[in-house]
């Protein structure tokens, strides 16, 4: 089994553009991840369809043609096959190298390259080529940028809307640590149709799961966006299986509602590799269903809760439900 210990010796400085994954990625976080002997056996209710189809290949080719990244691939999402096969994708902008080292995440860490000024237009053209109706735009954390990448988000949305005027756009943003006000001011100039930022886990587990992030900061980000753009639904999500209790999940859901968050996603954490945080429990589908019921009682406009639910899974259906309830 895996365990968590105090971090030890730090490795050499990483060159810009070099992507660290696995053990190298988590080497400098406040806690040390001891690799598991093997990945845990998944229960019967977790079954993922192998992502092989003409639609999957076509979308991958389009991404490569326009030099784009999908979080579906970078984060090893279990729904990649279903979403790609239905002709939808979540795009990851600002490169594929993150400035954070979250040990649950499979996206690479390092010193990112400079932003690609052509990315907004390339992204817009790719989305137009694929004739998508609902798109989620997310990004790596870019702590190296003065605005955390908020202007690049706005530029992407603006270019996409030029070529696809009827499209619905959801943004899944980082926490804009240390630059919330400037980031939100920029975001308000070109707001998305849904503003999403994931809390990921309960406050007690932040040090081990989200080093460099702060639970209260993330809640405030969602609330302050809603204050600036009250007509846009806000959304957040949690991964279950990192060591949280059911009671802690309910408490976080209540805090979300106190901060006027409209939509909720709850999914099972799946350990990407032996060098990531270990799965502490596999939450039964009945428990996910119970969380969904409790969430609706609390006043969420839409709750997507299930073992394979991810932040952008069926995001179009969730947004439609939130706007018509």
From Swiss-Prot:
Catalytic activity, reaction form: [[Fe-S] cluster scaffold protein carrying a second [4Fe-4S](2+) cluster] + N(6)-octanoyl-L-lysyl-[protein] + 2 oxidized [2Fe-2S]-[ferredoxin] + 2 S-adenosyl-L-methionine + 4 H(+) = [[Fe-S] cluster scaffold protein] + N(6)-[(R)-dihydrolipoyl]-L-lysyl-[protein] + 4 Fe(3+) + 2 hydrogen sulfide + 2 5'-deoxyadenosine + 2 L-methionine + 2 reduced [2Fe-2S]-[ferredoxin]
EC number: 2.8.1.8
Positions with a binding annotation for [4Fe-4S] cluster 1: 72, 77, 83, 312
Domain of life per record: Bacteria
Keyword terms, alphabetized: 4Fe-4S, Cytoplasm, Iron, Iron-sulfur, Metal-binding, S-adenosyl-L-methionine, Transferase
Ranges of residues in domain Radical SAM core: 84-301
GO cellular component terms given for this protein: cytoplasm
Sequence positions that bind [4Fe-4S] cluster 2: 98, 102, 105
Keyword Metal-binding: yes
The record's free-text note on cofactor binding: Binds 2 [4Fe-4S] clusters per subunit. One cluster is coordinated with 3 cysteines and an exchangeable S-adenosyl-L-methionine.
Cofactor requirements of the protein: [4Fe-4S] cluster
InterPro entries per UniProt: Aldolase_TIM (IPR013785), Elp3/MiaA/NifB-like_rSAM (IPR006638), LIAS_N (IPR031691), Lipoyl_synth (IPR003698), rSAM (IPR007197)
Broad enzyme group: transferase
One family name in Pfam for this protein: LIAS_N
Main location: cytoplasm
Subcellular location: Cytoplasm
Molecular function GO labels: 4 iron, 4 sulfur cluster binding; lipoate synthase activity; metal ion binding
Pathway: Protein modification; protein lipoylation via endogenous pathway; protein N(6)-(lipoyl)lysine from octanoyl-[acyl-carrier-protein]: step 2/2
Family that this chain belongs to: Belongs to the radical SAM superfamily. Lipoyl synthase family.
Protein name: Lipoyl synthase
The organism's taxonomic lineage, starting at the top: Bacteria, Pseudomonadati, Pseudomonadota, Gammaproteobacteria, Pseudomonadales
